[in-house]
Regions:
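Mobile cap/lid helix-loop segments that gate and shape the active-site cleft of serine hydrolases
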Residues: 220-260, 265, 272-285, 294-297
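Alpha/beta-hydrolase-fold serine-hydrolase catalytic core, especially in secreted/extracellular enzymes
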Residues: 8-97, 270-378
Length: 378
């Protein structure tokens, strides 16, 4: 049977925590109650294991699917000032093609960090994910600083959407988390990528992908979820909260605790004053900071709050992210500084969508490609 029983589970489960699940006041009270459950490092580690297992079980990823060959397909490399771009497709499962773009620094003959670049939800196909100007800017900027950056399409977006995949599918969370795990496998397979310097960053729904992967996969050493970690908002899309990953018969959690599973690994929360992260400095961040303190790593977590900003990953936010990743992944921040010593993305080329595609008439997708969510053989 191609569609597992989790399809039914995801549609009917009473344990789903969706969207604005709590009021802002309720969320504060919940965090206060949770805080009393862990007063020592060992108590938090026990709680963390319960939450981590809850994510994997709720996503129907226990046991893990067998990891099959990624079989990457590459397009021709394009060279720019200080970095290159090459489109890539990998198989997260046999025939399930995850499409993306690989940004590499000019010099790949030395050990380099690896960064996964995730994206959120947009309505205009030409502004989808990795095709967006803000995504291309950060991907190229980080590559210029010395990182290998893999930006990939989320389920039902970009080239996956063109194949016939749907984003609003009951098992989108499962597929998306698995795709991220395999994207990380691919990143680590690249020659000279340092497994001890692996990061992930993304905004909105991409922020959810960032903290979820960091929560379940300790190969992520540094995480930067942007405009998404909230005590009262659990994500409004099935790819974030459409499976019972926050609640089970023996536990209930939220995205604040899930983000804190990254402790003691470095994490930067980026928040703004115009969405569900507006309370971060006073609500979410202190709780996460408390957990990092229990883990003897209080200095490893930071919050960049931009009260006048709106939801997105614009330059003002990237200016906060570049130094943090440079510090913790040992990147060369000077590579994106202008003559005045300020961060500048002026030399970065924003490519048209057609250049960022893996498959075309000249490079057709293999005949055995899985072209819809319901055809996946787990």
């Amino acid at each position: 049977m191609l569609v597992s029983s989790s399809y039914v589970l995801a549609q009917s489960n009473n344990n789903l925590c969706v969207g604005h699940y709590y009021s802002e006041e309720e969320a504060k009270n919940v965090l206060a109650e949770l805080k009393h459950q862990y007063n020592t490092k060992e108590e938090w580690k026990q709680r963390a294991e319960l939450i981590r297992n809850g994510i994997l079980k709720g996503a129907d990823l226990v046991p893990f699917p067998k990891k099959t060959p990624l079989k990457p397909i590459y397009t021709k490399k394009r060279s720019y000032d200080g970095y290159t771009v090459q489109n890539v497709a990998i198989e997260s499962l046999p025939g399930v093609f995850v499409t993306g773009s690989l940004y590499l620094p000019e010099n790949t003959n030395v050990k380099m960090p690896g960064i996964l670049s995730t994206h959120g939800h947009w309505s205009d196909p030409e502004e989808y994910g990795r095709f967006r100007e803000d995504a291309q800017m950060r991907n190229a900027g980080l590559a210029k600083m010395g990182a290998a950056v893999f930006a990939y399409d989320m389920v039902g977006y970009g080239e996956m959407q063109e194949l016939g995949w749907k984003h609003k599918h009951p098992l989108a969370f499962k597929q998306q988390l698995w795709n991220s795990i395999r994207a990380l496998d691919f990143l680590l397979s690249i020659e000279n990528v340092d497994p001890e310097r692996i990061g992930i960053t993304g905004a909105s729904g991409g922020g959810t992908q960032a903290f979820m992967l960091a929560a379940v996969d300790e190969r992520i050493k540094v995480s930067v979820p942007v405009v998404q970690v909230s005590a009262h908002f659990f994500g409004g899309c099935v790819c974030e909260s459409g499976m019972p990953v926050h609640k089970s018969e023996n536990h209930q959690t939220n995205n604040v605790e899930i983000a804190a599973l990254a402790a003691p690994r470095p994490m930067l929360l980026v928040s703004d004053g115009d969405d569900w992260t507006k309370n971060t400095p006073n609500v979410e961040f202190p709780h996460i900071q408390y957990i990092y303190k229990l883990m003897d790593a209080e200095k490893n977590v930071e919050n960049a709050h931009l009260p006048n900003d709106k939801h997105g990953y614009e330059f003002s936010k990237r200016k906060e992210v570049y130094p943090f990743l440079a510090k913790h992944l040992m990147l060369d921040l000077s590579a994106i500084l202008n003559s005045d010593g300020r961060i500048s993305e002026k030399e970065i080329v924003v490519e048209p969508m057609r250049k960022l595609k893996v498959f075309s008439n000249e490079n057709p997708i293999p005949d055995y490609a899985v072209k819809s969510n319901d055809e996946v053989n787990w």
